[in-house]
A protein has these predicted regions:
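N-terminal pre-domain/capping segments
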Residues: 1-101, 130, 168, 195, ...
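Active-site acidic/histidine proton-transfer and metal-coordination neighborhood
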Residues: 17-18, 53, 57-65, 75-172, ...
Length: 270
């Protein structure tokens, strides 16, 4: 399992070259980039193949591969509104384009429902991804659907059902260790989802009470028990990157990056 980090940890004031340099110097082995709004190191819907070639050269310079393409504009692929749904499909297609040109092997997808009822939205999402399957499989890029706090995936069973109904080896789960830790054990989700898990976001969580929680950095105090989490990942045969995901601080992000990379090293040894 390689140490990776999402570029959001660096901050939009830094260009791609500075971002790659800081991530490499901190001890990470890969970086996850983002399809996002405009920013110094954001990929956008307007990013071209020529733009991506420049990033490829930076990646080679620092010997830091791109592990995946995340996004903050995932859209509502489960929406009954055709225009809203098509916008979400376009995001997935753009992520696949970006990943292919950057040599990344996976993208992160965040299905949403908009104002569509939950059950109907899941079936619409499944049909949308079935339609996308030929495009996905043609690129050879893995698509991992992530459970975020938008009310779409409420349990590992919801994720498993959706992935299984889509029925492609290239569509699975992008598992976020912290996003399910408010009410359940991350290791239970890992065990249930098994080989459906294609990629992992490694994030900390601190559940102080039923109504009080926080997302501390990996090197800060949290309530996730990393021993069973790592045991569960090994049991299902996961060998992909562990991608840290956290926001950039004010000022230089180097200290947080270094401490986070060190924290992943310690977690890897558990």
């Amino acid at each position: 399992m390689k140490r990776s980090v999402n570029a959001w940890a660096v901050g939009a004031d830094y260009g791609f070259e500075e971002t790659f340099a800081k991530v490499k110097a901190a001890g990470f082995e890969a970086i996850e980039l983002n399809l996002d709004a405009d920013g110094a190191h954001a990929l956008t819907m307007e990013t071209t193949a020529a733009d991506l070639q420049k990033i490829v050269e930076i990646s080679k310079k620092f010997e830091l591969p791109v592990s995946g393409i995340s996004t903050s504009i995932g859209g509502n692929i489960g929406s009954a509104d055709e225009a809203e749904r098509q916008a979400a499909v376009d995001v997935v297609k753009k992520q696949l384009f970006l990943a292919k040109h950057l040599g990344a092997s996976a993208i992160l997808a965040v299905p949403g429902a908009g104002n569509t009822p939950w059950g109907e939205a899941h079936e619409i999402c499944i049909e949308a991804y079935r339609s996308l399957t030929p495009v996905i499989e043609d690129t050879g890029i893995l698509v991992g659907m992530e459970h975020v706090w938008n009310g779409f995936f409420l349990s590992p069973r919801d994720l498993a059902y959706t992935v299984d109904e889509i029925g492609s080896d290239f569509v699975g789960v992008y598992f976020d260790i912290a996003n399910c830790a408010d009410r359940s054990k991350s290791e239970d989700w890992i065990t249930f989802l098994g080989e459906r898990i294609k990629r992992v976001h490694i994030k900390n969580f601190n559940r102080k009470s039923v109504f009080e929680f926080a997302f501390p950095l990996l090197f800060e105090e949290g309530t996730i028990d990393w021993v069973p989490v790592m045991a569960a990942l090994r049991k299902i045969g996961y060998e992909g990157p562990l991608t840290a995901e956290f926001g950039a601080p004010e000022g230089d992000p180097s200290e947080n990056l270094i401490k986070s990379a060190d924290a992943i090293r310690r977690i890897q040894c558990l």
